[in-house]
Amino acid sequence: MSITTLAVPGVRGLTPYQPGKPIGELEREFALKRIVKLASNENPLGASPKVLEVVRRILGGTHLYPDGSGFELKAALAEKLGVEPAQIVLGNGSNDVLDLVARAFLTAGRNAVYSEYAFAVYPIATQTAGATGKTAPAHDGSRGPRFGHDLETMLERVDPDTRVVFIANPNNPTGTLLGRGELYSFLAALPEHVIAVVDEAYFEYARRPDHPDALEWLGEFPGLIVTRTFSKAYGLAGLRVGYAVTGVEIADLLNRARQPFNVNTLGLAAAAAALEDTGFLEATVQANDAGRSQLEAGFRERGFDFIPSAGNFVSFDLGRPATPVFDALLREGVIVRPLGNYGLPNHLRVSVGTAEEIDLFFAALDRVLVP
């Protein structure tokens, strides 16, 4: 008997999440001196100087457990977002919060619905909870933006056993964005037995006229959960801080399932400081707009189709299997993200970096594509 047969079926059938290749691993493998990492949608500006100052100040207290309630961070978030602290659930990154939702609402005999090309954590959280994942095909371009969520088809996938619908807006890895009217209509059409999770990890980057702020609808939809993170625009990916905002009753349920001390001392303090530095956030968004335009212009110049993005990354179609190009870029010291695991074997996703990093990426791409 294989020891793996003792595990629950949902875990046995999982494909592990593949993070971006670490810089240290590439240094060891190829003995490279200069490495450009554009794989994990991190903030190329780093973290706010105010955050770094706070972290240095509290390093001497790391032998103490953190505030398990996250009181100060929840108070700061509540004030900024116009909600009550009791509506907020803190997590070890927003992935932790997504997993909490699955553990609270999914089990064997229930299912979750999400879109094709949706964030890979949704099926992981769903299957680990023993539930079934139902994938709705994305738009093919005939009725909506290609690669975007087809909300009509997602709604058709909902049945009496559906308990959760996951929607990323903007979506990762495609960068596609749902407009205010279409997302509202979808939420209004969901039956009462379905929890709607709107994953807004890239919210701060998506400054489009029709971009919805799902927090505005919390009072109207009791089953709505909005998740956000400090890993992207706030530059705290290494400290792992995310959160959910929802109704008080759902927040209470999620907090019952939450592990004690799931957010560390440094993360709590850093996130609170990051919220205060609005100037750094604005600089981040402006730099991202410029970098995203630089990427799109480079792809356009080289004749590559790309998916217009509202996030801090752009995915493009090589027109050939992407893995060999990905491997060749690694040898050049450039780390990007292949999307074969998302069903896009010809695509690479490139995070927005500094202007210099983007130039280095395109120079490396040109070298590896020379016949």
Curated annotation (Swiss-Prot):
GO molecular function ontology, one term from the record: pyridoxal phosphate binding
Residues with PTM N6-(pyridoxal phosphate)lysine: 232
InterPro entries per UniProt: Aminotrans_II_pyridoxalP_BS, Aminotransferase_I/II_large, HisP_aminotrans, HistidinolP_aminotransfase, PyrdxlP-dep_Trfase, PyrdxlP-dep_Trfase_major, PyrdxlP-dep_Trfase_small
Keyword line: Amino-acid biosynthesis, Aminotransferase, Histidine biosynthesis, Pyridoxal phosphate, Transferase
Protein name, as recorded: Histidinol-phosphate aminotransferase 2
Alphabetical list of HAMAP family matching this protein: HisC_aminotrans_2
PANTHER family for the chain: HISTIDINOL-PHOSPHATE AMINOTRANSFERASE, HISTIDINOL-PHOSPHATE AMINOTRANSFERASE 2
Native organism: Methylococcus capsulatus (strain ATCC 33009 / NCIMB 11132 / Bath)
Pfam families assigned to the protein according to its UniProt record, in alphabetical order: Aminotran_1_2
Top-rank taxon: Bacteria
Catalytic class of the enzyme: transferase
Listed pathway(s): Amino-acid biosynthesis; L-histidine biosynthesis; L-histidine from 5-phospho-alpha-D-ribose 1-diphosphate: step 7/9
Family: Belongs to the class-II pyridoxal-phosphate-dependent aminotransferase family. Histidinol-phosphate aminotransferase subfamily.
Record's subunit section: Homodimer.
EC nos: 2.6.1.9
Cofactor or coenzyme needed: pyridoxal 5'-phosphate
GO biological process: L-histidine biosynthetic process
Coiled coil (UniProt feature): none
Catalytic activity: L-histidinol phosphate + 2-oxoglutarate = 3-(imidazol-4-yl)-2-oxopropyl phosphate + L-glutamate
